[in-house]
Amino acid sequence: MRITLFDVQAMKPAGQRIAMLTAYDHPSAVLAERAGVPMLLVGDSLGMAVHGFDTTLPVTLDDMIRHARAVVRGTSRALVVADLPFLTYATEADAIASARRVMQEAGVQALKLEGGATIAPTVRRLTELGVPVMGHLGLTPQSQHTLGLRVQARQAAEARRLLDDALALQDAGAFAIVLELVPTELAQAVTRRLQIPVIGIGAGAGCDGQVQVWHDILGLFPGKSPRHAKRFAEIGTAIEDALRAYVSEVQSGTFPTEAQSSRMKPDELSRALNAE
């Protein structure tokens, strides 16, 4: 049975930490579900992690639907949340149209929107229409040209604004909120003030749960990972080694072997070659 937003919300008073992870395709969704990840995020971060863009801004609604549909097909238990991408919810009408497409065409169970009090009316309207919404505050990548890619809300006024935004989203009906790259102390204070779950990324250990990017925690990309990510494996190195071995065996003629080949009866081959 699939996890519901009510199950997720019940984890907070029960003291159960929520593990959330991005997934962008069918294989990653299958593996994440087998590992027991309760909530998967089809983030617009796929623009960078999968498509090679420098930002999330080029990601379209069609991109999100295509990837989210694949993730949903790979799950039967995990709650699947999808981002609405840049400027697809600038107005209430846009948000409703975008939400309808993603919910109907991809089959996700919830949507994530970036922004605070300014989008609270949109969040309220979507929830009234039966669309579960997760908020996203702090570093909001769709606003990186105005906010920058840095830790947010270090100063008192900014911190107060973030808390007010979180309360506004909760009041509008958001079932949970992601806090990205905010000071640990502030994230913990917001988590304590809210009744809904707060899921952190680069926001310290005081949140109700954590979300991380698939590629970061598996070490798929060479070089240094983001500071907030722990590399639980070095899958990228393992893949590279396997590919080198494949190239080497093809070039040396040691692959394929008899084990990877099929045979036919000699007389059948003869009849085929000599047929007029």
Swiss-Prot record:
It catalyses: 3-methyl-2-oxobutanoate + (6R)-5,10-methylene-5,6,7,8-tetrahydrofolate + H2O = 2-dehydropantoate + (6S)-5,6,7,8-tetrahydrofolate. It is found in: Cytoplasm. One of its GO terms (biological process) is pantothenate biosynthetic process. GO terms for cellular component: cytoplasm. It comes from the Bacteria. Keywords: Cytoplasm, Magnesium, Metal-binding, Pantothenate biosynthesis, Transferase. Its cofactor is Mg(2+). Its EC number is 2.1.2.11. One of its GO terms (molecular function) is magnesium ion binding. Its main location: cytoplasm. CDD domains: KPHMT-like (cd06557). 3-methyl-2-oxobutanoate binds at D44, S45, D83, K112. Binds 1 Mg(2+) ion per subunit. Mg(2+) binds at D44, D83, E114. Pfam families: Pantoate_transf. Residues 256-276 are annotated as: Disordered. The active site is at E180. Pathway: Cofactor biosynthesis; (R)-pantothenate biosynthesis; (R)-pantoate from 3-methyl-2-oxobutanoate: step 1/2. Homodecamer; pentamer of dimers. Belongs to the PanB family. Catalyzes the reversible reaction in which hydroxymethyl group from 5,10-methylenetetrahydrofolate is transferred onto alpha-ketoisovalerate to form ketopantoate. This is 3-methyl-2-oxobutanoate hydroxymethyltransferase. It comes from Gluconacetobacter diazotrophicus (strain ATCC 49037 / DSM 5601 / CCUG 37298 / CIP 103539 / LMG 7603 / PAl5).
